From Swiss-Prot:
Binds to DNA and alters its conformation. May be involved in regulation of gene expression, nucleoid organization and DNA protection. The lineage of its organism: Bacteria, Pseudomonadati, Chlorobiota, Chlorobiia, Chlorobiales. Belongs to the YbaB/EbfC family. GO terms for cellular component: bacterial nucleoid; cytosol. This is Nucleoid-associated protein Plut_1285. GO terms for molecular function: DNA binding. It comes from the Bacteria. It comes from Chlorobium luteolum (strain DSM 273 / BCRC 81028 / 2530) (Pelodictyon luteolum).
Length: 109
Protein backbone atom coordinates (compact mmCIF):
# COMPACT_ATOMS: atom_id res chain seq x y z
CA UNK A 1 0.00 0.00 0.00
CA UNK A 2 1.22 3.49 -0.78
CA UNK A 3 1.69 6.30 1.67
CA UNK A 4 -1.19 8.70 2.14
CA UNK A 5 -0.93 11.88 0.11
CA UNK A 6 -0.15 14.80 2.43
CA UNK A 7 -1.99 17.24 0.18
CA UNK A 8 -5.14 15.11 0.31
CA UNK A 9 -4.90 14.88 4.09
CA UNK A 10 -4.60 18.67 4.39
CA UNK A 11 -7.58 19.13 2.08
CA UNK A 12 -9.66 16.77 4.25
CA UNK A 13 -8.64 18.65 7.39
CA UNK A 14 -9.64 21.95 5.79
CA UNK A 15 -12.99 20.48 4.68
CA UNK A 16 -13.63 19.15 8.18
CA UNK A 17 -12.92 22.61 9.63
CA UNK A 18 -15.32 24.23 7.16
CA UNK A 19 -18.00 21.68 7.99
CA UNK A 20 -17.49 22.30 11.70
CA UNK A 21 -18.06 26.04 11.17
CA UNK A 22 -21.21 25.28 9.18
CA UNK A 23 -22.46 22.99 11.94
CA UNK A 24 -21.83 25.66 14.59
CA UNK A 25 -23.93 28.15 12.56
CA UNK A 26 -26.71 25.58 12.10
CA UNK A 27 -26.80 24.79 15.81
CA UNK A 28 -27.46 28.43 16.65
CA UNK A 29 -30.55 28.35 14.42
CA UNK A 30 -32.01 25.13 15.85
CA UNK A 31 -34.47 25.70 18.68
CA UNK A 32 -36.09 23.28 21.11
CA UNK A 33 -37.81 23.53 24.46
CA UNK A 34 -38.48 21.78 27.72
CA UNK A 35 -41.17 22.17 30.32
CA UNK A 36 -42.02 21.04 33.81
CA UNK A 37 -45.00 20.96 36.10
CA UNK A 38 -47.42 20.27 33.27
CA UNK A 39 -46.36 23.42 31.43
CA UNK A 40 -46.13 25.73 34.45
CA UNK A 41 -42.49 26.41 33.52
CA UNK A 42 -41.23 26.46 29.92
CA UNK A 43 -37.67 26.96 28.67
CA UNK A 44 -36.51 27.46 25.08
CA UNK A 45 -32.89 26.76 24.09
CA UNK A 46 -30.92 26.65 20.86
CA UNK A 47 -28.68 23.90 19.53
CA UNK A 48 -25.67 25.54 21.16
CA UNK A 49 -27.41 25.01 24.49
CA UNK A 50 -28.07 28.69 25.14
CA UNK A 51 -31.27 29.53 27.02
CA UNK A 52 -33.34 31.80 24.77
CA UNK A 53 -36.43 32.22 26.92
CA UNK A 54 -37.94 31.23 30.24
CA UNK A 55 -41.64 31.42 31.05
CA UNK A 56 -43.12 30.86 34.51
CA UNK A 57 -46.85 30.69 35.14
CA UNK A 58 -47.60 33.68 37.41
CA UNK A 59 -49.93 31.54 39.52
CA UNK A 60 -47.00 29.56 40.99
CA UNK A 61 -44.86 32.55 41.94
CA UNK A 62 -45.85 32.36 45.62
CA UNK A 63 -44.04 29.03 46.07
CA UNK A 64 -40.35 29.85 45.53
CA UNK A 65 -39.12 26.32 46.22
CA UNK A 66 -41.52 24.82 43.69
CA UNK A 67 -40.54 27.45 41.11
CA UNK A 68 -36.86 26.65 41.61
CA UNK A 69 -37.46 22.92 41.22
CA UNK A 70 -39.59 23.38 38.12
CA UNK A 71 -37.12 25.80 36.50
CA UNK A 72 -34.29 23.32 37.04
CA UNK A 73 -36.36 20.47 35.64
CA UNK A 74 -37.45 22.49 32.60
CA UNK A 75 -33.91 23.72 31.86
CA UNK A 76 -32.48 20.22 32.14
CA UNK A 77 -35.23 18.85 29.90
CA UNK A 78 -34.56 21.52 27.27
CA UNK A 79 -30.79 20.99 27.41
CA UNK A 80 -31.18 17.23 26.99
CA UNK A 81 -33.42 17.79 23.96
CA UNK A 82 -30.93 20.32 22.60
CA UNK A 83 -28.05 17.87 23.02
CA UNK A 84 -29.92 15.13 21.14
CA UNK A 85 -30.91 17.58 18.40
CA UNK A 86 -27.32 18.85 18.10
CA UNK A 87 -25.90 15.33 17.79
CA UNK A 88 -28.40 14.50 15.05
CA UNK A 89 -27.58 17.71 13.16
CA UNK A 90 -23.82 17.23 13.49
CA UNK A 91 -24.05 13.65 12.27
CA UNK A 92 -26.25 14.69 9.35
CA UNK A 93 -24.10 17.63 8.24
CA UNK A 94 -20.68 16.14 8.94
CA UNK A 95 -21.30 12.85 7.18
CA UNK A 96 -18.89 10.98 9.44
CA UNK A 97 -16.01 13.45 9.01
CA UNK A 98 -16.56 15.04 12.43
CA UNK A 99 -17.23 13.41 15.78
CA UNK A 100 -20.37 15.04 17.28
CA UNK A 101 -18.87 14.82 20.77
CA UNK A 102 -15.91 16.99 19.70
CA UNK A 103 -18.22 19.82 18.67
CA UNK A 104 -20.52 19.47 21.66
CA UNK A 105 -17.55 19.74 24.04
CA UNK A 106 -16.62 23.08 22.45
CA UNK A 107 -20.05 24.72 22.18
CA UNK A 108 -19.23 27.42 24.69
CA UNK A 109 -16.11 28.60 22.89
Amino acid sequence: MGMPNFGDMMKQIQQAGEKMQDVQKQLEKLVTSGEAGGGMVKVTVNGKQRVLSLWIDPEIMDDAEMVQDLVLAAVNSALEASGRMAQEEISKVAGGMINPQDILKNLGQ
